[in-house]
Amino acid sequence: MISSNDFRTGTTIELDGQVWRVVEFLHVKPGKGSAFVRTKLKSVQNGNVVEKTFRAGESVQQAILEKSNLQHTYVESGDYVFMDMTSFEETRLSSEQIGKGAKYLKEGMEVNVIFHNGKVLEVELPISITLKVTETDPGVKGDTASGGTKPAILETGAQVMVPLFISVGEMIRVDTRNDSYLGREN
């Protein structure tokens, strides 16, 4: 159990049979009446965001999460196979369980998988990854860094918008949170 006074950004709690992560919290102490904690909670399972108010000092069930560092080894019949780097056990996850990050997975990539009661809740990819551009429109002389953008398809099949000067075969860094181009990789 955790007190609502101990909420911090990132704290995970169990509420109504779901696991929620505290995104924002604010301790409010009105002049009249008792203090309370106003929170914004995000469901770890489906990403829904709700606002909920707790009485100050109210006890809430804290969610116990296990984080494992797994390495993506291969894809078999639509399932992504991961190997635990310490116990060498294999874990199979569907693209629905992985979420939008599935388009960035390549063999040998390490990810953090978060479990709750033996079930996969979330797959955390590295914030930025380096991938090779396999398909894009050719660059034209005079394209500059401050100009426009064009679509590019990466080695994993993901599509991102890149500057006009990027060409096929280049290695680029991509932000996996918002699918944005971060820069060239040397």
From Swiss-Prot:
This protein's UniProt keywords: Cytoplasm, Elongation factor, Protein biosynthesis
| UniProt-listed GO biological process terms | peptide biosynthetic process
The GO terms this record gives for MF are: translation elongation factor activity
Q: Sorted alphabetically, which SMART domains does this protein's record hold?
A: EFP, Elong-fact-P_C
GO CC terms, sorted: cytoplasm
Q: What does this protein do?
A: Involved in peptide bond synthesis. Stimulates efficient translation and peptide-bond synthesis on native or reconstituted 70S ribosomes in vitro. Probably functions indirectly by altering the affinity of the ribosome for aminoacyl-tRNA, thus increasing their reactivity as acceptors for peptidyl transferase.
Q: Which family does it belong to?
A: Belongs to the elongation factor P family.
What protein name applies here? Elongation factor P
The species this protein belongs to is Prochlorococcus marinus (strain MIT 9301)
What is this organism's lineage? Bacteria, Bacillati, Cyanobacteriota, Cyanophyceae, Synechococcales
